[in-house]
């Protein structure tokens, strides 16, 4: 078995060795809940990597969105080049769930655009768990959604060995059963092709490599892995496992049993609807379900097959769905990154799903078994866990209450101190703010200003602009792409002051920021809680000359705790710097990635000017739609999700305009 081995030119320093030892020891002792409290810039990901190396357990790292998951995945791949580091997020570029709005009698059909590359990565993740133990999967909260039965997935796997007696047609039949399609012309992921005694299989978990099985009569003569593009042999294999092309693949025997149970549930539900004088709903349910059953009998699956997952798995009513967590062995390790944000997300998922399903079941669009195609409840999520490490700069009450061991990581290897916090009275705050802004701009740095209300943010932005300060306002209506462009422009010095209400969201770790000001800091509430204040102060923790000004007439408990905690961290870092002769230096952070995203924002202007685009296509709306669809697929393939999503919206607008004209 391959062992986890961290490859890095750095060694753990500062608080890292102590944190690694403490958490690793807790894992060895069997502690279920532990917390790693790590300040911004202290190297939490490197600490996590070293804990994984010591624990030697299959590991799931849970992040609260796709972007953070991708960043973590890239970092772990650098630390573990010889181990399996996989990425598991929702494969939808666009997803409109099935719904029914009773007030307007509107049925909204499920509409989705699946990203083929992410689907491949999901298959790569699950197959890795069956093939090896040295696996790290970085996932978003989509890992708590139903995925199909892991036992069935494993049972349907086709195992091929050199010298094995196996009839070629029998293998082809099994490939079709696990939802591979024969395609001798367009050989792509999830397909196979046949030419004489040669069978080529393109695994669902691959994008460029396929398997060639050569037969001599009824015996497997040779197995090779080859490059799909060039046809060149990469390596000769003694054995290969072909995993199903769908996580919802089901054996014929189980499918027949499931269909029988679906028919019984349908009969029972139709009787119930008729008894309530819901004749239309009963007829609708019968027609839709019978169509699904017919599809399952003919091709082994149907659109929306996940709504029958409980019946296909043979689970009892109300039991939790099988998820990615069930694909892991029992002794797996879970890291929950930014746990103060991720855990509330996990808690909220199931309630939202149920409210949407209520109307679908009530009005005869779905059988009641659809309720069990859902995310896990928080209690079910807890029950599936083995050992958990919460990772956060500001862990919430849940993490601290449940954790039996807490390790703290305050020291930054760069020597950077937490910023100095100055409290000033509200009277004259705007004049004082203006003076502080001018002083900071003269030094060549940037400023973040947080307000409590939208009106104050707008008024302050207008005032600063009138005073000749280059200022922008970051509000909730600004989408991700434009937001990234604003941050990019701030870093470049296109403007100097960024005003906002909630500046805690990702993407605001800006080394050029040397001043963070918090207006109305003494107004207790969500945006001025201890957690929010510590996170806001952290925005200034990337610059050696940074400081934070809090404007307030009284020092609230949240302010007091924030100041006390920041001063404690500053003292620890200063003592460490003095002992090791470290001079704090501002983090030099490459802005290349932000520029790339900003380029996408520039491209949007072209798509937004549809009248000009139509003129260039002689008002041929179909040709323009075709062009944009091609660009959307290309963008999705290149993992440019923001660009692909915007193109999708443009295409919908064009299609609506076309229908209106007709």
From Swiss-Prot:
Residues 429-595 form the Helicase C-terminal domain. It is found in: Cytoplasm. Residues 622-657 form the UVR domain. GO terms for biological process: nucleotide-excision repair; SOS response. HAMAP family: UvrB. The gene is uvrB. It comes from the Bacteria. The beta-hairpin motif is involved in DNA binding. The UvrABC repair system catalyzes the recognition and processing of DNA lesions. A damage recognition complex composed of 2 UvrA and 2 UvrB subunits scans DNA for abnormalities. Upon binding of the UvrA(2)B(2) complex to a putative damaged site, the DNA wraps around one UvrB monomer. DNA wrap is dependent on ATP binding by UvrB and probably causes local melting of the DNA helix, facilitating insertion of UvrB beta-hairpin between the DNA strands. Then UvrB probes one DNA strand for the presence of a lesion. The keyword DNA repair applies. PROSITE patterns: HELICASE_ATP_BIND_1, HELICASE_CTER, UVR. This is UvrABC system protein B. It comes from Clostridium botulinum (strain 657 / Type Ba4). NCBIfam families: PRK05298.1, uvrb. PANTHER family: UVRABC SYSTEM PROTEIN B. The keyword Cytoplasm applies. ATP binds at residues 38-45.
């Amino acid at each position: 078995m391959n062992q986890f081995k961290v490859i890095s030119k750095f060694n753990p320093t500062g608080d890292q060795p102590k944190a690694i030892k403490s958490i690793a020891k807790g894992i060895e002792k069997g502690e279920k809940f532990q917390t790693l409290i790590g300040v911004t810039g202290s190297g939490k990901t490197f600490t996590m990597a070293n804990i994984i190396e010591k624990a030697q357990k299959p590991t799931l790292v849970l992040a609260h969105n796709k972007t953070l998951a991708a960043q973590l995945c890239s970092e772990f791949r650098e630390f573990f080049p010889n181990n399996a580091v996989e990425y598991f997020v929702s494969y939808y570029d666009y997803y409109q769930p099935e719904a029914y709005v009773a007030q307007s009698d509107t049925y909204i059909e499920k509409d989705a655009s699946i990203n083929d590359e992410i689907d491949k990565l999901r298959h790569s993740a699950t197959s890795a768990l069956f093939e090896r133990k040295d696996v790290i999967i970085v996932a978003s909260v989509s890992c708590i959604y139903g995925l199909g039965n892991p036992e069935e997935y494993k049972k349907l796997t086709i195992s091929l060995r050199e010298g094995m007696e196996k009839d070629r047609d029998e293998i082809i039949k099994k490939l079709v059963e696990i939802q591979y399609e024969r395609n001798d012309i367009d050989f792509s992921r999830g397909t196979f092709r046949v030419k004489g005694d040669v069978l080529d299989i393109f695994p669902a978990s691959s994008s460029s490599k396929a398997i060639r099985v050569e037969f001599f009569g009824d015996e497997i003569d040779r197995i090779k892995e080859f490059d799909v593009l060039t046809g060149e042999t990469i390596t000769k294999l003694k054995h290969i496992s072909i995993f199903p092309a769908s996580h919802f693949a089901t054996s014929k025997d189980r499918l027949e049993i499931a269909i029988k149970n679906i028919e019984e549930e349908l009969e029972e539900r139709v009787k119930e609807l008729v008894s309530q004088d819901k004749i239309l709903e009963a007829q609708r349910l019968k027609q839709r379900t019978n169509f699904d059953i017919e599809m399952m009998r003919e091709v082994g699956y149907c659109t929306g097959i996940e709504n029958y997952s409980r019946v296909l798995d043979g689970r009892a009513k109300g039991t939790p769905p099988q998820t990615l967590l069930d694909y892991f062995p029992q002794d797996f390790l879970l890291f929950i990154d930014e746990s103060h944000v991720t855990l509330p997300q996990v808690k909220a998922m199931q309630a939202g799903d149920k409210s949407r399903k209520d109307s679908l079941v009530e009005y005869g669009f779905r059988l009641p078994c659809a309720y069990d195609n859902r995310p896990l409840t928080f209690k079910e999520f807890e029950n599936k866990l083995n050992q958990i490490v919460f990772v956060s700069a500001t862990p919430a009450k849940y993490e601290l209450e449940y954790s039996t061991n807490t390790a703290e990581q305050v020291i930054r290897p760069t020597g950077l101190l937490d910023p100095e916090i100055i409290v000033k009275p509200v009277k004259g705050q705007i004049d004082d703010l203006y003076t502080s802004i001018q002083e900071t701009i003269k030094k060549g740095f940037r400023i973040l200003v947080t307000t409590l209300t939208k009106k104050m943010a707008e008024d302050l932005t207008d005032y600063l602009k009138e005073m000749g300060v280059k200022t922008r306002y970051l509000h909730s209506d600004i989408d991700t792409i434009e937001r990234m462009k604003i941050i990019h422009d701030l870093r470049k010095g296109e403007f100097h002051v960024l005003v906002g209400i909630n500046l805690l969201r990702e993407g605001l770790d800006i080394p050029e920021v040397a001043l963070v000001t918090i207006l109305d800091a003494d107004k207790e509430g969500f945006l001025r809680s201890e957690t929010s204040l510590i996170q806001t102060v952290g925005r200034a923790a990337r610059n050696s000359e940074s400081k934070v000004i809090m404007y307030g007439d009284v020092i609230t408990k949240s302010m007091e705790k924030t100041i006390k905690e920041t001063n404690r961290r500053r003292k620890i870092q200063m003592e460490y710097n003095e002992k090791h002769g470290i001079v704090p230096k501002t983090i030099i952070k490459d802005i290349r990635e932000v520029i790339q995203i900003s380029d996408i924002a520039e491209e949007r202007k072209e798509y937004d000017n549809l009248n000009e685009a139509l003129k260039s296509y002689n008002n041929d709306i179909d040709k323009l739609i075709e062009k944009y669809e091609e660009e959307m697929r290309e963008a999705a393939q290149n993992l440019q999700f923001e660009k692909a999503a915007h193109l999708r919206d443009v295409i919908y607008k064009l299609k609506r305009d076309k229908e209106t004209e007709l």
